[in-house]
């Protein structure tokens, strides 16, 4: 397949859709922003795409909890269609608020029919965390999005990023990325782990490796110039986040 199309899902309160669209276009995909109401009216539109993105933001104002309203809409009205999309080889990524929604639908860690198993809740600091973080990628993960990546340096911006679940569930997660300190050491204290999330987990995937979600924002660092200290630190032209999107597009193109 030469042409790849990515659906950028929008809801009231989504505010990272433009950056996510730009990241996928930079990676070689065509994109289309589709409002949730349009998708609810015509779920068959999913068949037009190879990748589906749940961007960051504050969907529905997070009034009932981060990602909760969107999760209910997806689970109750789009669940079967999304399952078919995934079964046909489609890729799904959730970023920040998108991660929260995917967790609350049960899509992650999955399967959706088993319901919600984990949650993302208030940061230990009790405040909104907006900072740059160092991440290590699990070399044993099956995640399509992170193949060939060892380390990442990405920003976070969230108030509810603390991953919680029973020890049994947490230990079985397909954990993909972890918070570390600057030297790559895990189990580092705040602010290296900005939310206080269990086992330093910053992102997970389903068993197939084709559904991936993370709290940091890769779409906010696809060019070196997006970093506030780009000239001073002599950062390369390509930001760390871009590889996540190019991996997805490359994989979708081969299907």
UniProtKB/Swiss-Prot annotation:
The active site is at 96 (nucleophile), 217, 219. Pfam families: GATase_5 (PF13507). Transmembrane segments: none annotated. It catalyses: N(2)-formyl-N(1)-(5-phospho-beta-D-ribosyl)glycinamide + L-glutamine + ATP + H2O = 2-formamido-N(1)-(5-O-phospho-beta-D-ribosyl)acetamidine + L-glutamate + ADP + phosphate + H(+); L-glutamine + H2O = L-glutamate + NH4(+). CDD domains: GATase1_FGAR_AT. One of its GO terms (cellular component) is cytoplasm. Residues 6-255 form the Glutamine amidotransferase type-1 domain. This is Phosphoribosylformylglycinamidine synthase subunit PurQ. InterPro entries: Class_I_gatase-like, PRibForGlyAmidine_synth_PurQ. Part of the FGAM synthase complex composed of 1 PurL, 1 PurQ and 2 PurS subunits. It comes from the Bacteria. GO terms for biological process: 'de novo' IMP biosynthetic process. Keywords: ATP-binding, Cytoplasm, Glutamine amidotransferase, Hydrolase, Ligase, Nucleotide-binding, Purine biosynthesis. Disulfide bonds: none annotated.
